[in-house]
Amino acid sequence: MSDSAGGRAGLRRYPKLPVWVVEDHQEVLPFIYRAIGSKHLPASNVSFLHFDSHPDLLIPVNMPADTVFDKETLFGELSIENWIMPAVYAGHFSHVIWFHPTWAQQIREGRHHFLVGKDTSTTTIRVTSTDHYFLSDGLYVPEDQLENQKPLQLDVIMVKPYKLCNNQEENDAVSSAKKPKLALEDSENTASTNCDSSSEGLEKDTATQRSDQTCLEPSCSCSSENQECQTAASTGEILEILKKGKAFVLDIDLDFFSVKNPFKEMFTQEEYKILQELYQFKKPGTNLTEEDLVDIVDTRIHQLEDLEATFADLCDGDDEETVQRWASNPGMESLVPLVQSLKKRMEVPDYEMVHQAGLTCDYSELPHHISTEQEIECLIQSVHYLLKNLPNPTLVTIARSSLDDYCPSDQVDTIQEKVLNMLRALYGNLDLQVYAAESPPS
């Protein structure tokens, strides 16, 4: 493919494709900003292809929106879950495609159009999206409450590891035709199909390729030969998204290929269950009015503020009187057995970490799927097949996510090497820069 996703006039070109490898995912943003500053990326209308088991699309809840215009301050405010949206509000990213594995389904599948702007009442960044992902964090506000609005197109696309068929004859066991597929699932269409699986593959529309893929197990089996699954993505659809932008960044979190929920190892099953009860966000119904949505968000914000205050107070002292006082509040009764269990296991519980764990227990758990070697390899092939049909990115960013235990530490190096080999096969020599053990540039 050509090495541009759209008009690149006036932009500088890297001699070799730069690939930056960091540890924590928010550490990639300084490299992207540096590319904007050096005119390798445009300052606006950038498409962002994000392969990850987590969307990373939350927003620093209390950060003033204008912080995005002071990059040094901004970089210090960001965390692994909230570093993309500030770049949207700053006007840099106009399209985000979240490619996710089958075990990560935090945001509704398909295309989302919404606004990102400054909340006039709080001066913080907020969105008009009503997806549960944003509602559960209290990030929704009505459109008329936002100023300096930036439109965002978010496409959520599922990538399935393509299973190699095992019924080949032995002399066909090694075949160059074992090609992966990309799956795009539209949750609204799922119920209307009689598919055993929710998605079809992404293939080039050539007879040659279709015949090449006969050795692959279908990822979607329909009950009727005449019925087609209405959930297939085409390369053309993704290309159309990229054509709308001036350039695109390829971003890969290694936990896309294998992921842990680190909090499950920090707490007992009973403690984790209590956290889910305390922090749960009940999914609202459909056909809600704007007033209903505002009420839901207000209730959720107060719930989270009360929980934050509770565990902040416990950091100062977790005597029985303090615990009972907080547990007397509605819905907080299970705080007593939680604290008792924590104190049995550790001399001084880390209540700040308890709160951080609780924040991940809203309407769904964090994804947890430790992949087999074969699953990792099949996902690598799926990503390779997708990317080879797309233009070349301007730059690539990679997050290891292993020190915080999201990508299993015993797999991360192998996954990283596989990803780098995939990139070399796609793009040739790379300008590889590893900052995983260092501070990223300012």
UniProtKB/Swiss-Prot annotation:
Stored Pfam families: UPF0489 (PF12640)
Q: Which residue ranges have biased composition labelled Polar residues?
A: 189-200
Tell me which stretches of the chain form a coiled coil: none
Q: Where is this region: Disordered?
A: 175-210
Q: Which family does it belong to?
A: Belongs to the UPF0489 family.
- What is the official name of this protein in its record? UPF0489 protein C5orf22
Write down the species. Answer: Homo sapiens
